[in-house]
């Protein structure tokens, strides 16, 4: 378990930074390329541990995939061409891999066994396995399919009209992917609109998808046709440097090629509402996945209330938003965030515990956090608990803390941002 020591940044963070490829889009590009007909070339791929797990799993099912840094070539097998894996499909720490892949495996004629690390073993799978079972897939696992390892034997699926109790792109995507080979029209309705990378990419691969408010539909029997994919930078990774630029004195950062999918830009809306000073320059208007260059500088922030429809648009950014709130004048309330409890860690409890160690005034209830600003943070020993987003949030916190901050289990950041610490060090010079 590796440690990282973070020293206070006295002269600000300054410079340009190219944000690594979007994790959600990278996963989907590999998966959709694997079940498409033809060869897909992916540029801007994120070579982090999670996305490499996706490549590994589909290679195990006979897909020819060549990865060279951030460029990947996938020779598609078509929807019916995947082969029965000879070994257990290991997703590592990736919830996206296991949930979306379950939707694909639900319509394959073979048996597969899927598992991940100890974090995955604690994450709820029934939200995905239940609707897939309703469609006709044979799925089992610990506690009746609630937890991994899962065994999946696909079947002749029938379309369903499913109302999801949670706004989850992973649940929605698993059902839609199963629906590609189901008889009839599959529909998923959510309480709030979740990120729509699956819908956008399916359309790019030639699948007709219908969107009606909070409902997404597709007809079974459609094939995917290979296409080239350009992956923009991950706004969830950019969030750490957006907050850093706003709260570290004497900072000015230019973040290049940041994905600006409107279902993901809640962090931008929140920073604007808090009073951050930044500009957004679109760079590829009209693209399937829009992107922009963002310039941000040290700002005076104020506390706000965050909740409702915006939560699915910033669910992964809440840990670093909580950090920003510790440096804002007044009280910030983050509510309706119960989904944080079933991430890589219980992120409500973890954020509160670790920021409290650094001197923040922060409280938790069942689905919310209340943060009292403005807090003077002091260095301490903290822990990511294997959660990449907690690790990066704590690193930014260490930059404004008095004295050194030691982060235990710091290597977790490699899941989504392998070069994070190197970039941070470069910008601090």
Swiss-Prot record:
**Pathway this chain belongs to:** Metabolic intermediate biosynthesis; chorismate biosynthesis; chorismate from D-erythrose 4-phosphate and phosphoenolpyruvate: step 6/7
Binding of phosphoenolpyruvate occurs at 23, 95, 123, 170, 347, 389
Q: Which domain of life is it from?
A: Bacteria
GO terms for cellular component: cytoplasm
Stated role: Catalyzes the transfer of the enolpyruvyl moiety of phosphoenolpyruvate (PEP) to the 5-hydroxyl of shikimate-3-phosphate (S3P) to produce enolpyruvyl shikimate-3-phosphate and inorganic phosphate.
Catalyses: 3-phosphoshikimate + phosphoenolpyruvate = 5-O-(1-carboxyvinyl)-3-phosphoshikimate + phosphate
Localisation per UniProt entry: Cytoplasm
Q: Which keywords does UniProt give here? A: Amino-acid biosynthesis, Aromatic amino acid biosynthesis, Cytoplasm, Transferase
As for family, the record states: Belongs to the EPSP synthase family.
Instruction: Provide the transmembrane region boundaries.
Output: none
EC assignment: the record states: 2.5.1.19
Single GO MF descriptor: 3-phosphoshikimate 1-carboxyvinyltransferase activity
- What is its EC class? transferase
Give the species this sequence originates from: Bacillus anthracis
Q: What is this protein called?
A: 3-phosphoshikimate 1-carboxyvinyltransferase
Highest lineage ranks of the organism?
A: Bacteria, Bacillati, Bacillota, Bacilli, Bacillales
Q: Which residues take part in binding 3-phosphoshikimate?
A: 23-24, 28, 168, 170, 316, 343
Q: Enumerate the Gene Ontology biological process terms.
A: amino acid biosynthetic process; aromatic amino acid family biosynthetic process; chorismate biosynthetic process
């Amino acid at each position: 378990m590796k440690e990282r020591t973070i020293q206070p940044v006295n002269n600000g963070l300054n410079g340009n930074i190219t944000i690594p490829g979007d994790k959600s889009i990278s996963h989907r590009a590999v998966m959709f390329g694997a079940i498409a007909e033809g060869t897909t070339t992916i540029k801007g791929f994120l070579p982090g541990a999670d996305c490499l797990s996706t490549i590994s799993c589909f290679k195990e099912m006979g897909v020819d995939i060549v990865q060279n840094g951030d460029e990947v070539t996938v020779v598609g097998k078509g929807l019916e061409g995947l082969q029965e894996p000879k070994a257990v499909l290991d997703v590592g720490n990736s919830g996206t891999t296991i949930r979306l892949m379950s939707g694909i495996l639900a319509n394959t004629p073979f048996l597969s066994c899927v598992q991940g690390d100890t974090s995955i073993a604690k994450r709820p799978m029934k939200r995905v396995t239940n609707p897939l079972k309703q469609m006709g897939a044979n799925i089992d696992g610990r506690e009746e399919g609630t937890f991994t390892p899962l065994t999946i034997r696909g079947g002749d699926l029938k379309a369903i009209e499913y109302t999801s109790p949670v706004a989850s792109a992973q649940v929605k995507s698993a059902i839609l992917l199963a629906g590609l080979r189901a008889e009839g029209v599959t529909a998923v309705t959510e309480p709030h609109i979740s990120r729509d990378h699956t819908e956008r990419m399916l359309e790019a691969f030639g699948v007709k998808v219908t969107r009606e408010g909070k409902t997404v539909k597709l007809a079974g029997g459609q094939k995917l046709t290979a296409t080239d994919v350009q992956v923009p930078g991950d706004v969830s990774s950019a969030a750490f440097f957006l907050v850093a630029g706003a709260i570290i004195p004497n900072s000015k950062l230019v973040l290049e090629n940041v994905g600006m999918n409107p279902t993901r830009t809640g962090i931008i809306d929140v920073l604007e509402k808090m009073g951050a000073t930044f500009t957004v320059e679109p760079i590829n208007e009209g693209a399937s996945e829009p992107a922009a260059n963002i310039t941000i500088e040290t700002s005076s922030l104020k506390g706000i209330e965050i909740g409702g429809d915006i939560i699915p648009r910033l669910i992964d950014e809440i840990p670093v938003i909580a950090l920003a709130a510790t440096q804002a004048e007044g009280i910030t309330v983050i509510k309706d965030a119960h989904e944080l409890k079933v991430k890589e860690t219980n992120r409500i409890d973890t954020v509160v515990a670790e920021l409290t160690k650094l001197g923040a005034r922060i409280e938790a209830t069942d689905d919310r956090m209340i943060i009292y600003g403005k807090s003077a943070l002091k260095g301490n020993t903290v822990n990511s608990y294997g959660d990449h987003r907690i690790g990066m949030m704590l690193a930014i916190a260490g930059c404004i803390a008095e004295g050194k901050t030691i982060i235990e289990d710091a290597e977790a950041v490699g899941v989504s941002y392998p070069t994070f610490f190197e970039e941070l060090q470069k910008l601090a010079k």
